[in-house]
From Swiss-Prot:
Molecular function per GO: DNA binding
Record's keyword terms, sorted: Repressor, Stress response, Transcription, Transcription regulation
Annotated protein name in UniProt: Heat-inducible transcription repressor HrcA
Family in the record: Belongs to the HrcA family.
Domain of life: Bacteria
Gene: hrcA
Amino acid sequence: MLKRIKVGSDLNKKESLLDAFVKTYLQTLEPISSKRLKELANLKVSCATIRNYFQILSKEGMLHQAHSSGARLPTFKAFENYWHKSLRFEVLKVNEKRLKSASENFGLFTLLKKPSLERLERVIECEKRFLILDFLAFSCAVGYSVKMEKFLLELVGRSVKEVRLIAASVNALSLARQLERLEYSSAQITRFNLMGLKTLLNSPLFFDILEGKVLERFKKGLHFIEPDCMLVTRPIEFQNERMQLLCVGKLECDYEGFFQTISKEE
Protein backbone atom coordinates (compact mmCIF):
# COMPACT_ATOMS: atom_id res chain seq x y z
CA MET A 1 0.00 0.00 0.00
CA LEU A 2 1.37 3.41 -1.00
CA LYS A 3 2.05 6.00 1.66
CA ARG A 4 0.44 9.39 1.46
CA ILE A 5 3.13 12.01 0.99
CA LYS A 6 2.93 15.28 2.87
CA VAL A 7 5.00 18.05 1.35
CA GLY A 8 3.64 21.01 3.27
CA SER A 9 1.29 23.82 2.33
CA ASP A 10 3.57 25.75 -0.04
CA LEU A 11 2.95 23.40 -2.95
CA ASN A 12 3.58 25.91 -5.71
CA LYS A 13 7.32 25.76 -5.22
CA LYS A 14 9.29 23.64 -7.65
CA GLU A 15 11.36 22.03 -4.93
CA SER A 16 8.31 20.84 -3.01
CA LEU A 17 6.78 19.33 -6.12
CA LEU A 18 10.07 17.75 -7.18
CA ASP A 19 10.51 16.20 -3.73
CA ALA A 20 6.96 14.83 -3.91
CA PHE A 21 7.68 13.47 -7.38
CA VAL A 22 10.84 11.62 -6.33
CA LYS A 23 9.22 10.26 -3.16
CA THR A 24 6.30 8.97 -5.20
CA TYR A 25 8.60 7.41 -7.77
CA LEU A 26 10.54 5.61 -5.03
CA GLN A 27 7.28 4.00 -3.93
CA THR A 28 6.01 3.04 -7.39
CA LEU A 29 9.13 2.77 -9.61
CA GLU A 30 6.86 3.67 -12.53
CA PRO A 31 6.57 6.73 -14.81
CA ILE A 32 4.35 9.30 -13.11
CA SER A 33 1.72 11.49 -14.76
CA SER A 34 0.40 14.74 -13.33
CA LYS A 35 -2.86 13.05 -12.36
CA ARG A 36 -1.11 10.17 -10.61
CA LEU A 37 1.22 12.50 -8.72
CA LYS A 38 -1.72 14.61 -7.57
CA GLU A 39 -3.51 11.50 -6.27
CA LEU A 40 -0.59 9.70 -4.65
CA ALA A 41 1.08 12.74 -3.12
CA ASN A 42 -2.26 14.29 -2.16
CA LEU A 43 -1.33 17.61 -3.78
CA LYS A 44 -3.77 20.50 -3.48
CA VAL A 45 -3.02 21.97 -6.90
CA SER A 46 -4.51 21.31 -10.32
CA CYS A 47 -3.13 18.80 -12.80
CA ALA A 48 -2.53 21.71 -15.19
CA THR A 49 -0.29 23.41 -12.63
CA ILE A 50 1.60 20.17 -12.07
CA ARG A 51 2.09 19.77 -15.83
CA ASN A 52 3.51 23.29 -16.01
CA TYR A 53 6.03 22.38 -13.34
CA PHE A 54 6.79 19.15 -15.19
CA GLN A 55 7.78 21.23 -18.21
CA ILE A 56 9.95 23.57 -16.14
CA LEU A 57 11.65 20.71 -14.31
CA SER A 58 12.21 18.86 -17.60
CA LYS A 59 13.95 21.92 -19.06
CA GLU A 60 16.13 22.06 -15.95
CA GLY A 61 17.16 18.43 -16.41
CA MET A 62 15.31 17.10 -13.37
CA LEU A 63 12.66 15.06 -15.21
CA HIS A 64 12.43 13.39 -18.59
CA GLN A 65 9.42 12.16 -20.50
CA ALA A 66 8.96 8.41 -20.40
CA HIS A 67 6.71 8.13 -23.46
CA SER A 68 4.11 10.02 -25.44
CA SER A 69 1.57 9.94 -22.60
CA GLY A 70 3.35 12.73 -20.75
CA ALA A 71 4.35 10.66 -17.72
CA ARG A 72 7.77 11.53 -16.38
CA LEU A 73 10.76 9.88 -14.72
CA PRO A 74 13.35 11.46 -12.42
CA THR A 75 16.82 11.98 -13.87
CA PHE A 76 20.20 11.39 -12.23
CA LYS A 77 20.23 15.10 -11.39
CA ALA A 78 16.88 14.80 -9.59
CA PHE A 79 18.05 11.81 -7.53
CA GLU A 80 21.33 13.55 -6.70
CA ASN A 81 19.44 16.63 -5.51
CA TYR A 82 16.93 14.57 -3.52
CA TRP A 83 19.41 12.30 -1.73
CA HIS A 84 21.75 15.14 -0.81
CA LYS A 85 18.84 16.88 0.89
CA SER A 86 17.19 13.84 2.45
CA LEU A 87 19.94 11.69 3.96
CA ARG A 88 21.66 12.32 7.29
CA PHE A 89 24.89 10.71 8.44
CA GLU A 90 24.98 10.94 12.23
CA VAL A 91 25.61 7.78 14.28
CA LEU A 92 22.65 5.43 13.83
CA LYS A 93 21.68 2.83 16.40
CA VAL A 94 20.89 -0.27 14.37
CA ASN A 95 18.46 -3.07 15.14
CA GLU A 96 20.54 -6.13 14.22
CA LYS A 97 17.45 -8.33 13.72
CA ARG A 98 16.22 -6.12 10.89
CA LEU A 99 19.46 -5.53 9.00
CA LYS A 100 19.57 -8.71 6.92
CA SER A 101 15.92 -8.66 5.86
CA ALA A 102 15.95 -4.91 5.20
CA SER A 103 19.02 -5.21 2.96
CA GLU A 104 17.22 -7.82 0.87
CA ASN A 105 13.85 -6.05 0.86
CA PHE A 106 15.33 -2.71 -0.21
CA GLY A 107 17.73 -4.24 -2.75
CA LEU A 108 20.90 -2.95 -1.07
CA PHE A 109 24.27 -4.54 -0.50
CA THR A 110 25.34 -3.67 3.03
CA LEU A 111 28.60 -4.23 4.84
CA LEU A 112 29.52 -3.74 8.49
CA LYS A 113 33.12 -3.23 9.45
CA LYS A 114 34.49 -3.21 12.96
CA PRO A 115 37.98 -1.74 12.64
CA SER A 116 40.98 -3.58 14.01
CA LEU A 117 41.92 -2.06 17.36
CA GLU A 118 45.39 -3.57 17.44
CA ARG A 119 48.29 -1.26 18.30
CA LEU A 120 52.01 -1.59 17.71
CA GLU A 121 53.24 -2.99 21.03
CA ARG A 122 56.95 -3.28 20.32
CA VAL A 123 59.61 -3.48 17.63
CA ILE A 124 61.97 -6.44 17.91
CA GLU A 125 65.41 -6.29 16.28
CA CYS A 126 66.65 -9.71 15.08
CA GLU A 127 70.43 -9.93 14.62
CA LYS A 128 70.54 -6.73 12.57
CA ARG A 129 68.74 -8.61 9.80
CA PHE A 130 65.03 -8.07 10.47
CA LEU A 131 62.70 -5.87 12.44
CA ILE A 132 59.53 -7.53 13.72
CA LEU A 133 56.51 -5.35 14.37
CA ASP A 134 54.49 -6.95 17.16
CA PHE A 135 50.77 -6.06 17.29
CA LEU A 136 49.99 -8.94 19.71
CA ALA A 137 47.24 -10.42 17.50
CA PHE A 138 49.61 -10.49 14.52
CA SER A 139 53.07 -9.43 13.47
CA CYS A 140 55.07 -8.63 10.36
CA ALA A 141 58.72 -8.22 9.46
CA VAL A 142 60.80 -5.78 7.42
CA GLY A 143 64.45 -5.63 6.53
CA TYR A 144 66.72 -4.05 9.12
CA SER A 145 68.25 -0.61 8.92
CA VAL A 146 69.15 1.86 11.64
CA LYS A 147 66.90 4.43 10.01
CA MET A 148 63.94 2.03 9.81
CA GLU A 149 64.39 0.91 13.41
CA LYS A 150 64.39 4.51 14.65
CA PHE A 151 61.33 5.28 12.50
CA LEU A 152 59.34 2.30 13.80
CA LEU A 153 60.24 2.83 17.45
CA GLU A 154 58.62 6.25 17.22
CA LEU A 155 55.38 4.55 16.14
CA VAL A 156 55.01 2.23 19.13
CA GLY A 157 51.54 2.70 20.62
CA ARG A 158 49.95 3.71 17.32
CA SER A 159 47.08 1.75 15.75
CA VAL A 160 47.75 -0.56 12.82
CA LYS A 161 45.90 1.89 10.56
CA GLU A 162 48.03 4.82 11.72
CA VAL A 163 51.25 2.85 11.22
CA ARG A 164 50.10 1.81 7.74
CA LEU A 165 49.21 5.34 6.66
CA ILE A 166 52.46 6.79 8.01
CA ALA A 167 54.46 4.04 6.29
CA ALA A 168 52.74 4.81 2.99
CA SER A 169 53.38 8.54 3.43
CA VAL A 170 57.16 7.99 3.69
CA ASN A 171 57.14 5.53 0.76
CA ALA A 172 57.67 2.41 2.88
CA LEU A 173 55.24 0.70 0.53
CA SER A 174 56.20 -2.92 1.23
CA LEU A 175 55.44 -2.41 4.92
CA ALA A 176 52.22 -0.52 4.12
CA ARG A 177 50.99 -3.39 1.92
CA GLN A 178 51.77 -5.98 4.59
CA LEU A 179 49.89 -3.99 7.18
CA GLU A 180 46.93 -3.49 4.86
CA ARG A 181 46.57 -7.26 4.40
CA LEU A 182 46.88 -7.88 8.12
CA GLU A 183 44.51 -5.07 9.03
CA TYR A 184 41.75 -6.30 6.75
CA SER A 185 42.23 -9.94 7.72
CA SER A 186 41.82 -9.03 11.39
CA ALA A 187 38.93 -6.60 10.91
CA GLN A 188 35.48 -8.03 11.53
CA ILE A 189 33.43 -7.67 8.35
CA THR A 190 29.83 -8.80 7.90
CA ARG A 191 28.03 -8.65 4.55
CA PHE A 192 24.34 -8.76 3.69
CA ASN A 193 22.59 -9.29 0.33
CA LEU A 194 25.48 -9.88 -2.07
CA MET A 195 22.94 -9.82 -4.91
CA GLY A 196 22.78 -6.06 -4.41
CA LEU A 197 26.21 -5.86 -6.07
CA LYS A 198 25.29 -7.68 -9.28
CA THR A 199 25.05 -4.45 -11.31
CA LEU A 200 28.63 -3.59 -10.30
CA LEU A 201 30.30 -6.84 -11.37
CA ASN A 202 32.27 -5.03 -14.07
CA SER A 203 33.01 -1.96 -11.98
CA PRO A 204 36.64 -1.27 -11.02
CA LEU A 205 35.32 -0.67 -7.50
CA PHE A 206 33.70 -4.10 -7.18
CA PHE A 207 36.37 -5.82 -5.05
CA ASP A 208 37.11 -2.72 -3.00
CA ILE A 209 33.40 -2.56 -2.13
CA LEU A 210 33.18 -6.30 -1.43
CA GLU A 211 36.21 -6.14 0.89
CA GLY A 212 35.15 -2.88 2.53
CA LYS A 213 38.23 -1.01 1.34
CA VAL A 214 36.11 1.84 0.00
CA LEU A 215 35.49 2.82 3.62
CA GLU A 216 39.11 3.93 3.60
CA ARG A 217 38.79 5.86 0.35
CA PHE A 218 35.45 7.58 0.83
CA LYS A 219 34.57 9.83 3.72
CA LYS A 220 31.29 9.60 5.59
CA GLY A 221 28.37 10.54 3.39
CA LEU A 222 26.95 10.03 -0.08
CA HIS A 223 28.96 9.11 -3.18
CA PHE A 224 27.79 8.55 -6.76
CA ILE A 225 29.98 5.78 -8.12
CA GLU A 226 28.30 4.74 -11.37
CA PRO A 227 25.73 6.39 -13.68
CA ASP A 228 22.87 4.68 -11.83
CA CYS A 229 24.39 3.62 -8.49
CA MET A 230 25.40 5.25 -5.27
CA LEU A 231 27.25 4.42 -2.10
CA VAL A 232 26.49 5.57 1.44
CA THR A 233 28.86 5.33 4.39
CA ARG A 234 27.98 6.26 7.95
CA PRO A 235 28.93 5.36 11.52
CA ILE A 236 26.54 3.10 13.41
CA GLU A 237 26.12 1.50 16.79
CA PHE A 238 25.57 -2.23 16.33
CA GLN A 239 25.32 -4.73 19.19
CA ASN A 240 26.60 -1.99 21.52
CA GLU A 241 29.74 -1.45 19.45
CA ARG A 242 30.71 1.38 17.11
CA MET A 243 31.15 0.24 13.51
CA GLN A 244 31.08 1.58 9.97
CA LEU A 245 28.15 0.83 7.67
CA LEU A 246 28.47 0.72 3.90
CA CYS A 247 25.36 0.64 1.67
CA VAL A 248 25.48 0.26 -2.09
CA GLY A 249 22.59 0.18 -4.53
CA LYS A 250 20.77 1.81 -7.40
CA LEU A 251 19.72 5.45 -7.28
CA GLU A 252 16.06 4.48 -7.05
CA CYS A 253 16.47 2.28 -3.96
CA ASP A 254 14.68 3.75 -0.95
CA TYR A 255 17.64 4.59 1.29
CA GLU A 256 15.47 6.69 3.59
CA GLY A 257 13.10 3.80 4.14
CA PHE A 258 16.03 1.44 4.69
CA PHE A 259 17.60 3.56 7.42
CA GLN A 260 14.24 4.05 9.10
CA THR A 261 13.62 0.29 9.04
CA ILE A 262 16.96 -0.68 10.59
CA SER A 263 16.94 2.12 13.16
CA LYS A 264 16.78 0.80 16.70
CA GLU A 265 13.78 2.16 18.55
CA GLU A 266 14.57 3.66 21.92
